[in-house]
């Protein structure tokens, strides 16, 4: 038996152990080397097709990422994994939208690094989460433990910040995806949409003064409220006659009346219950 065959046997035995000794495994995240360069390895070097076949045999429901170099056959992977950047829009393959998950870190390092200072703020992380969902994606967020096996205090602070925001805003994330194209995104906002409840969520990045303009929303909104406290927001579609204190609206536009003071949360969210 040559060296490569021994490697394949070891690999298959380890993969079999992982996929048979720990109950149902939902996801297999492969992270093999690149094919380019003098020491590059391609999908044939790793027998990537064999990995996929074995994984699907042992765990038929499993989903596998696209890092095995098998780009020709869509059956060989289930989702793509852009790392450390945010796609400009829902990623496509052959002009078709595909499932995707962005791989991100709390700081600039995947593992614990004592002297790493480029940590993302709680606000940045929440905006990243909302933007990912608004483009139909999932967010993988890495936390590297210390040599003591605990999380850095900076990571704990940010995890608590995410948890606090999610306590009242999870409905704008879980079960949500990109909004239908008929709903235009207001300025300085992000839209997420739950197709099961038919609710649209407006994540307001910059809090406007008193009014939020929604173009072409007339007849589409049943009720509006802030998610952080479930307080109702009034909205109107017509300009009050004989007043210098109200904005003009387009024929099919809606204006939501906002409190002057921004809600005291990292990212305010308006929930629209649609008609």
What are these regions (language model features)?
Residues 96, 100-101, 107-168, 175-190:
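Aromatic/acidic polysaccharide-binding cleft in carbohydrate-active enzymes
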Residues 191, 230-254:
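Extracellular/luminal ectodomains and secreted, surface-exposed scaffolds of diverse proteins
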Residues 17-59, 63-105, 149-158, 186-191:
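Substrate-binding cleft/loops of secretory-pathway carbohydrate-active enzymes
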Residues 28, 136, 202, 270:
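Conserved, mostly hydrophobic/aromatic
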Residues 216-232:
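Solvent-exposed beta-hairpin/edge-strand motifs
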Residues 243-275:
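C-terminal beta-strand-rich structural cap/linker in extracellular carbohydrate-active enzymes
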Residues 1-10:
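Single conserved hydrophobic/aromatic residue that forms the stacking wall/gate
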Residues 167-218:
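Surface beta-strand/loop "capping" patches
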């Amino acid at each position: 038996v040559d060296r490569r065959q021994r490697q394949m046997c070891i690999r298959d035995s380890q993969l079999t152990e992982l996929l048979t000794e720990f109950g149902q495994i939902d996801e297999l995240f492969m992270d093999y080397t690149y094919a380019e360069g003098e020491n590059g390895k391609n999908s044939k070097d790793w027998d990537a097709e064999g990995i996929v076949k074995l994984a699907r045999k042992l765990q038929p429901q499993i989903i596998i990422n696209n890092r095995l170099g098998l780009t020709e056959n869509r059956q060989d992977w289930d989702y793509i994994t852009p790392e450390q950047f945010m796609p400009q829009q829902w990623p496509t393959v052959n002009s078709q939208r595909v499932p995707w998950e962005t791989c991100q870190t709390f700081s600039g390092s995947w593992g614990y690094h004592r002297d790493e200072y480029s940590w993302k703020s709680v606000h940045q992380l929440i905006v990243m989460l909302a933007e990912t969902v608004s483009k139909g994606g999932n967010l993988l967020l890495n936390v590297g433990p210390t040599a003591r096996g605990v999380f850095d205090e900076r990571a704990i602070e940010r995890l608590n910040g995410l948890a606090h925001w999610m306590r009242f805003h999870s409905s704008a994330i879980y079960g949500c995806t990109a909004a239908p194209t008929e709903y235009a995104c207001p300025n300085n906002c992000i839209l997420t949409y739950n197709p099961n409840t038919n609710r649209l969520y407006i994540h307001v990045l910059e809090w406007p003064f008193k009014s939020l303009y929604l173009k072409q929303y007339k007849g589409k909104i049943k009720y509006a409220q802030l998610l952080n406290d479930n307080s109702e927001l009034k909205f109107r579609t017509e300009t009050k006659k004989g007043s210098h204190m109200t904005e003009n609206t387009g024929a099919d536009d809606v204006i939501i009346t906002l409190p002057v003071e921004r809600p005291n949360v990292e990212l305010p969210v308006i929930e629209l219950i649609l008609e």
